[in-house]
Amino acid sequence: MRPLLLAVGTFLIGTDVFVIAGMLPQIGDSLNVSVSAAGQLMTVFSVGYAVLGPLLAVPLSRRSPRVALTAALVAVALGNAVCAVAGSLPTAMAGRLLVAAGASQFTPHASSLAAALAPKGRSGKSLALVTSGLVMGSVVGVPSGTWAADVFGWRPTLAALAAATAAVAVPLAAGLRGVASQHTAQRPRERFAALRGPLVRMVLTVTIFAVIAEYAVLTYAATVFAGATAGEGSRLAVLLFAFGLGGLVGNFLAGAYMDRPAGRRLVLVSVAGMTVAFLAMPQLSGSFPGALVAMVLWGVTGWMYAAPQQHRLLRLAGPAGPVAVSLNSSVIYVGAALGGGAGGLFLGQAAPRWLPLMAAVLCASAVVTELRLLRKDRPTEPAPAPA
């Protein structure tokens, strides 16, 4: 029951992160600002998540999982409630900042707890279950939320999201009663020393290469696949839905193999697979069937590294695991911003169909870094028992 509640929580977080994008025109009209000004709500969230994630993770990691996770969900619920009643853009921005504070803590602490409570040899599957909530949020939650905003309005939709988040916080708090923090005894200096290690830095380097590559293409997907969609939004929606379904498959495969010896190479398979997908994209993006194949391949490989990266950081960082995962989340948001910027600069110099080749180069850099990491991070074999 606990892993399922954690997955429901990450589903709501995943929905909350992206659903606001579909509401920007309505929010702008309601608050008497332009759509571009309303878009600052996305910027505030991203910056808040990236900055507050590691900062808040340090004090919250000393608390019990019950306190940390409940506080995170309450912050998300309150932030959405503030947005739902906001009469001005600054008030709505304050609400999104509160949502960012809570969201930045829920996912890393949920991941850490899922791994800690899992039976021996099943921590990877538990992590993948939690991560599946994020994938489902983008595949199902975001389209549903956008539809609800069109039918009922953006304020009732955010209010409903706030109520749903608060409703999950209640059984989660009850289910985690008596679950103590795993690392309350260590001194802060000892607990966070692992974050300075070269292996942790290499893991984060792989993440940022991969994320910059993905968001360089994802941000401009409508332009890259214009030949396949002929400018029709419905066709683009199908391509993005296919990407999301591929993500579900990739996350499932990660969960199935993460606890096996072959799980060491999941991230390598992921970034290498993305390299292939991006290299093939210029040839496939001109037709709708070809674009569909490219998006499914990208979705499968692109979502295959998320849970294994968290799994590896929790192992390498030890007591500072939640902080390391939070730092990884911050790197993702920084990489997303850099990817969008890099993609825009590239499109100013070259045709859109060649943008995936830039992403392929970045993914190839992730492959090189991952190969170096695998050579340095070799699992230790248990010492043989004395005769």
Describe each PLM feature range.
Residues R264-P308:
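C-terminal transmembrane helical hairpin of 12-TM major facilitator-type secondary transporters
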Residues G175-V206:
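Juxtamembrane intracellular "pre-TM" segments in multi-pass secondary transporters
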Residues G79, P90-L98, P289-L297:
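Paired small-residue
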Residues L52-P65, G250-G263, L347:
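Helix-to-loop junctions at the C-terminal end of transmembrane segments
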Residues S30-N32, S64, V85-T91, L284-S285:
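Helix-breaking motifs and short loop linkers at transmembrane-helix boundaries and internal kinks
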Residues V51-G87:
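Conserved MFS/SLC helix-loop-helix module at the cytosolic interface between two early adjacent transmembrane helices
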Residues L89-T91, P119-R177:
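Helix-loop-helix hairpin linking two adjacent transmembrane segments in secondary transporters
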Residues G95-L134:
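Cytoplasmic helix-loop-helix junction between adjacent transmembrane helices
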